UniProtKB/Swiss-Prot annotation:
Organism for this UniProt entry: Burkholderia pseudomallei
Composition skew (Polar residues), residue ranges: 508-518, 1125-1147
Subunit (UniProt): Specifically interacts with cognate immunity protein CdiI, which blocks its tRNA nuclease activity. The CT domain forms a tetramer both with and without tRNA; each subunit binds tRNA in its presence.
The protein, known as: tRNA nuclease CdiA
Compartments it resides in: Target cell, Target cell cytoplasm
Region of interest called Disordered, as start-end residue ranges on this chain: 317-340, 491-518, 1124-1164
Record region (Pretoxin (PT) domain): 252-991
């Protein structure tokens, strides 16, 4: 027994007693003292350590009675009572903690570490028996452990608080170092709060009574058996204690080398709070409050019945965890660095990133009974927010107003990034360098597209990369082989100075509604009684669920079952710009260049996602409202539904919505100027996307099972995209309402993403580029990108219905809709539509695909053009070889192939169409764009000739071939658009520019093809002449000697037989002659395919159609070999006048021996051309005739023959000259030649023959003029009919002898 008038101080005392009767007149102190020591180590580290001294213990083996006139102070002290405890504290009873820890500072060579680590030791009360504790003031326990073995009562006139003790530990550190070329500095700060809650335990019923408030904060009341009863005159607060964690860091790193340096700076600031909720657990729990009961982020649970009764409000809500984070990162490089690909830079680059994020997360409360009932009564409002009420049996909530709704989680994220780069860059230039650079960039782009799941763009980038590798390789090989000239590839080194900047900002804000739930194994009943105020007595359940066997919602006024809404808002923007100027030096000399580009974009999206309320009863759901009942964004599901609505019944579905929009645009251009030429280019892109979605995800309605529905509504029943349904027999369904209105909800989904762009460019002289419109020397164009269009539209209807059953309209005079038209099928009512895709990502992928398609389009068109050029060259070479060996059928076939592979040819166009289909399909993503690409490419290739005409016409008008070429490209683009849309326009432009416009050999090859065709026609006609006897009229019959191809006997004037093509002599028939006025007979003509003609005179001749047939390869001998006939024609006599000798080809002499012109003779010189034309000479001479601006293959062939027989070398006379050719070497050096009668085609020859007699006088006048101006005037008479030849010879005989001496007749 201890009785004092003053204080009893048991600080760090150890008191033991069998029983205790302590009466302190003032304070009772049961503290454990602390002690602090200070230490300094050898290395200078300091330590201040606080520890507990001897523990303060008051140990009573039996019963204890403690009475104080003042406070009972207990800090880390221990009260242990083996029996019963009877305490009467006159003041406050404070059960606190003592804080211990160590503050340590360590100084190192590279920095300082400052740590302060703390912990708390709480007080304890352990009672083996029953407890009867009365406190005249407040009872406050922080971080304490209280164990009331057999329960009892704890009562205070003031507040009773079971709370958490808090300690904070901090770490502060900094370090730095410098190693010459490397340095760093870093600082770190961390502060962590630790909470130690109070724990109250007991073995039997414990009563906690307060004259004011009861607070259980971050603490636990846990009874093994018995009930936990909390009764307060004020509030009862069961809540969470919040601990805070802070982390801050700063770092800088730098590295410097001989040629480069790097600096990195980063920071991180993070703060988070964590709510530690409370727990009250016992067999049964009863909480009573004279004011409010607040359960926040905590759990109140009993094995049996749990009851909460408050005179005012009961709030069962959430606690919240929060976080805020901010990071920065800056990186700066200076000096030598990679410039991308095979280039390097010297300069500065900077990267700055900032990220911010924050969040609020709700922690639900749970109040309930495991196998008993849960009863919650509030005099005013029962509010369940983001929390759960649960009972194994019944849940009953009664209040003036009841709100069961959701708590809102929020997240915010924001990112910013800025980059800049400036300095000098050294890289490859020239066409080969450009191809290499683009191959690298396209390869990287293909990888990025694949990462972005853009397979089409990845494939197109890969095609472009492969093409760039191939073009670069071909160009490099050509350079190694010593290629020269305007079309030769180039390579060089470029040094440029420039800068670039980019920025990006994005943010996303989300709200997520965490609904409440009420779950009962038996009945769930919510009753809103109202408090006598009008419009009071409401039940509102928002975005939450009620589940029970039977659910009853009874409201004095309204029952509101409504949805909640999640939101998601995103915003983004970006911009970039750059410019550079440079100087290059390479195989094309010295050049300068400049470029600039700019881009910007933005995107926004707002989404709303609805969360329906659900009332689920396995048996019966009952709704009774004195006013309206609103089932909006909610569902009532039960086996049987009973509703008695004193106002209106409104049932409506709500739609999820998404509205999004994005924009992106870019533009750029540049120019290059070198010693060999220059070029300029410009490109632009623009994209817009938008999406709009509104759709009912979950239809609202009242759904009954086999029990049916019995709904009575005093006012109007309105269904908006909603239903009252049942699976029961119609006899169990009844709707009685004043009036009934219904309507449907239209759902829709629309999105559209469109991207368009173009590139334009031109070059003069020799281009130094490998990619883009300015890469084609001396040309240019405008190439549209393959238009990107992704869109979708869907619509559907959410219908209203009432299942079959009785519908009773109690106010028929007010009914406006015909109930007979009501939809009675309450199944499959919700027509859904798909949500819109991410339009901003779609826009980004479209831009990528457009760029990839443009790059690949050039590769494919240009590659096919190169392939076709090669095929054309191969066919020309094969045609020449066939001519050399006399195989005219094969020659014609190869000429046809060369034409087919030429610009405008079918083979080239077919292959371009295939390439167009590939690029159009991949670029546009559909069969239609593939068809469009094929149509545009094929049409552009087929109409290459028309484009050339446009180019020449515009070029002539403007005086600029470049303008003409651009006009041709624009025309091709328009034509492609007409036949193939966007893909057609893009591919048509590509084909015109990179195929037809990039074909430097086409003019020469076309001349060669035309010349070969002319040679073929001439040779075939000569073969026809030999077979048909056309020679007879020009050479005396006595001089004709024909070499039979198979070596058979000769036919001569002494042997009046004649020869057919099978090598056999035919018997002479009466009336048939061989002479100047007749041709060979029927067998010969039949062999020509001319039918069974009798002997005919020269006036009939062989028609132009016959010659055309010969020229097309129809002329064959009996064995099918045209070459034999041709060889026979070649072996005709040649010479001067009428005394020709046998061809050298038949006598073993060198073919092509020279003869001398008449040189003053009074008669024309006659040449019988028998040898094939020398193709090398023909190619040299077949150039544009400046007088007419065209190729003249007829003149070229005749000139080659003239060289062969007269010797020397001819060349085209310069523009303005009145003659065709001039000898530049040989015996006639310096003399001029002016040809006549040298048709280029069989059709021209036929026309000459048709009108020769009528135009003879004009012809002879022209002949006289030519003979007066030129030294030689060759006349190719081989294409004239016999009658016209006779007229020509007679007319020449009438000319002055001086002029006749200049004439050379070619036969």
């Amino acid at each position: 027994s201890l009785d004092t008038t003053g204080n009893v101080d048991l600080t760090s005392a150890n008191v033991k007693a069998g029983s205790l009767d302590l009466n302190a007149g003032n304070k009772l102190i049961l503290d454990t003292a602390t002690q602090t020591t200070h230490q300094v180590s050898r290395d200078g580290a300091t330590s201040d350590k606080t520890t507990l001294g001897p523990a303060a213990n008051l140990n009573v083996a039996g019963d204890a009675s403690i009475k104080t006139g003042g406070d009972f102070q207990q800090n880390a002290g221990n009260l242990n009572v083996g029996g019963n405890l009877n305490a009467n504290i006159g003041g406050n009873w404070n059960l606190g903690v003592q804080q211990t820890g160590e503050h340590k500072v360590v100084q190192r060579a590279n920095g300082v570490s400052d740590t302060d680590l703390n912990s708390a030791t709480g007080s304890t009360v352990n009672v083996g028996g029953k407890s009867a504790i009365g406190v005249g003031g407040d009872l406050t326990a922080q971080g304490a452990r209280l164990d009331f073995g057999q329960g009892g009562t704890v009562a205070a006139k003031g507040n009773v608080t079971f709370g958490a003790a808090s300690t904070t530990s901090t770490i502060n550190a900094n370090s730095s170092g410098d190693q010459g070329n490397r340095s760093y500095a870093e600082t770190r700060h961390g502060a962590d709060q630790a909470l130690t809650g109070t724990t109250v335990k007991g073995g039997d019923t414990l009563n906690v009574v307060s004259g004011k408030d009861i607070n259980v904060i971050g603490s636990t009341i846990d009874l093994k058996k018995g009930d936990a009863n909390l009764l307060a005159a004020g509030d009862v607060n069961v809540g969470a204690a919040t601990e805070t964690h802070v982390y801050n860091s700063r770092e800088t790193h730098s590295r410097s080398g001989v040629v480069s340096g790097t600096k990195i700076a980063s920071s991180q600031d993070a703060t988070s709070t964590v709510a530690n909720g409370s727990l009250i657990s016992a067999d049964g729990v009863s909480i009573g409050s004279g004011k409010d009961i607040n359960v926040q982020g905590s759990t109140v649970v009993g094995t049996h019945d749990v009851a909460l009764n408050a005179a005012h409000d009961v709030n069962i809500t959430t606690s919240q965890d929060t976080s805020q984070s901010s990071t920065t990162y800056q990186e700066q490089h200076s000096g030598l660095m990679s410039g991308g690909g095979l280039s390097f830079s010297v300069g500065n680059s900077k990267l700055a990133q900032q990220n911010q994020s924050s969040s609020v997360t709700n922690n639900a409360s749970t109040v309930g009974s495991v196998d008993g009932n849960l009863t919650v009564n509030a005099g005013n409002t029962l509010h369940v927010k983001g929390s759960d009420l649960v009972a194994g049996k019944d849940v009953t909530g009664t209040a003036a107003n009841i709100v069961v709704d959701s708590a809102t989680d929020t997240t915010h994220q924001a990112q910013q990034q800025q980059t800049s780069k400036s300095g000098l860059t050294v890289g490859l230039s020239g066409s080969v360098g450009d191809a290499i650079n683009n191959a690298i960039s396209e390869t990287q782009a293909a990888r990025e597209s694949a990462k972005d799941s853009n397979g089409r763009a990845s494939a197109l980038h890969s095609i472009a990369a492969a093409g760039d590798v191939a073009f670069g390789g071909l160009g490099a090989k050509a350079l190694l082989d010593g290629a020269k000239g305007p079309q030769a590839p180039s390579i060089g080194v470029q040094v440029s100075v420039g800068s670039s900047h980019s920025s990006m900002q994005s943010s996303e804000d989300q709200t997520i509604q965490r609904g409440s739930s009420i779950n009962a194994g038996g009945n769930a009943k919510l009753i809103a009684t109202g408090n006598g105020t009008p419009k009071d007595g409401n039940i509102t359940i928002a975005g939450s669920n009620v589940n029970a066997a039977n659910v009853a919602l009874v409201a004095n006024n309204q029952v509101n079952l409504v949805n909640t809404t999640d939101t998601d808002k995103t915003q983004s923007s970006n911009s970039s710009s750059g410019s550079s100027v440079g100087v290059s030096i390479g195989t094309n000399g010295i050049g300068v260049s400049a470029s600039m580009q700019r881009a910007h974009g933005d995107g926004n999206s707002d989404a709303a996602i609805q969360n329906n309320t659900h009332i689920n009863a396995s048996q019966t759901a009952t709704i009774v409202s004195g006013g309206d009942t609103n089932v909006i964004g909610a569902n009532v599901n039960a086996n049987k539904v009973v509703a008695d609505v004193g106002g209106n019944l409104n049932v409506a579905s709500v739609q999820d919505t998404t509205v999004s929009a994005a924009h992106q645009s870019s533009a750029g251009g540049g120019f290059t100027i070198s010693q060999t030429g220059g070029g300029a280019s410009f490109s632009a892109q623009n994209g817009h996307a938008d999406g709009n979605y509104a759709g009912v995800k979950e239809q609202a309605g009242i759904q009954a099972g086999s029990g049916g529905f019995d709904v009575t509504v005093k006012g109007n029943t309105d269904l908006k995209g909603a239903y009252i349904g049942s699976t029961a027999d119609a006899s169990k369904n009844s709707l009685t309402t004043g009036t009934l209105t219904t309507s449907d909800i239209e759902n829709h989904s629309h999105y559209s993403a469109n991207s368009a762009g173009f590139s334009a460019g031109a070059s003069v002289g020799v281009s130094t580029k490998a990619v883009g419109p300015s890469s084609v020397s001396g040309s240019g164009g405008v190439t549209p990108m393959v238009f990107q269009n992704d869109s979708g539209d869907q619509s559907a209807t959410t219908k209203s219905a009432v299942s079959v059953g009785a519908i009773n309209i109690t106010k028929p005079g007010e009914q406006t809709q015909d109930v007979a038209n009501l939809n009675r099928d309450a199944t499959n009512l919700n027509g859904t539509v798909s949500k819109t895709p991410d339009v901003q990502k779609m826009l980004s992928q479209q831009a990528d695909t457009m760029n990839a398609a443009q790059a690949a389009g050039q590769t494919v068109s240009q590659g096919i053009g190169l392939y076709a050029d090669g095929k054309r060259k191969d066919a020309i070479d094969a045609a020449k070889a066939a001519y050399e060996r006399g195989d005219l059928v094969a020659m014609q076939s190869y000429i046809d192939q060369a034409k087919s592979w030429d610009e405008g040819g079918a083979s080239r166009a077919g292959l371009q169409a295939t390439g167009g289909a590939l690029i159009g399909g991949l670029g546009g993503g559909s069969v239609l764009t593939a068809i469009g690409g094929a149509a545009g490419a094929g049409t552009s290739s087929l109409l290459a000739g028309q484009a050339e005409k446009i180019s020449k016409s515009v070029g002539d008008m403007t005086g600029s071939s470049l303008v003409g070429n651009i006009a041709a490209n624009v025309a091709a683009t328009v034509g492609g658009a007409l036949v193939g849309g966007s893909a057609g326009a893009a591919m048509a432009s590509n084909v015109e520019l990179y195929n037809a416009g990039n074909d430097p050999q086409k003019t020469d090859d076309r001349a060669t093809i035309a010349g070969l065709q002319g040679l073929l026609s001439r040779t075939a006609a000569m073969a026809s002449d030999a077979k048909a006897g056309v020679w007879n009229g020009m050479v005396n019959v006595a001089g004709v000697i024909v070499n039979i191809p198979n070596g058979g006997p000769f036919a001569s004037p002494g042997d009046p037989g004649y020869v057919s093509l099978d090598g056999l002599k035919k018997p002479y028939k009466s009336g048939t002659s061989i002479g100047p006025d007749t041709e060979f007979l029927t067998p010969i003509l039949a062999t020509l395919g001319l039918g069974g003609k009798a002997a005919v005179g020269t006036d009939a001749g062989i028609t132009s159609a016959d010659v055309a047939t010969v020229g097309n390869g129809a002329l064959k001998n009996a064995s099918g070999d045209l070459s034999a006939a041709a060889n026979s024609a070649r072996n005709q006599p040649y010479g001067q006048g009428a005394s020709a000798s046998q061809s050298p080809g038949t006598q073993g002499a060198s073919s092509g021996s020279n003869i001398s012109a008449s040189n003053g003779s009074s008669s024309p010189t006659t040449i019988v051309a028998s040898n094939p034309v020398d193709l090398n000479a023909f190619d040299r001479l077949n150039v544009v005739d400046p007088a007419v601006g065209k190729f003249r293959p007829g003149e070229a062939g005749a000139a080659a023959e003239l060289e062969n027989y007269l010797g020397g070398t001819l060349q085209r006379a310069p523009q303005g000259s009145s003659v065709d050719f001039v000898f530049s070497s040989g015996p006639n050096n310096g003399k001029t030649v002016d040809f006549m009668l040298t048709p280029d085609t069989v059709a021209q020859a036929a026309k000459i023959n048709q009108f020769f007699d009528k135009n003879l006088n004009n012809f002879m006048n022209t002949l006289s003029d030519h003979a007066a101006a030129a030294d030689f005037v060759p006349l190719d008479s081989r294409f004239l009919s016999e009658a016209n030849k006779t007229l020509l010879v007679k007319a020449i005989g009438n000319l002055p002898q001086k002029l006749q001496a200049k004439i050379i007749l070619i036969k």
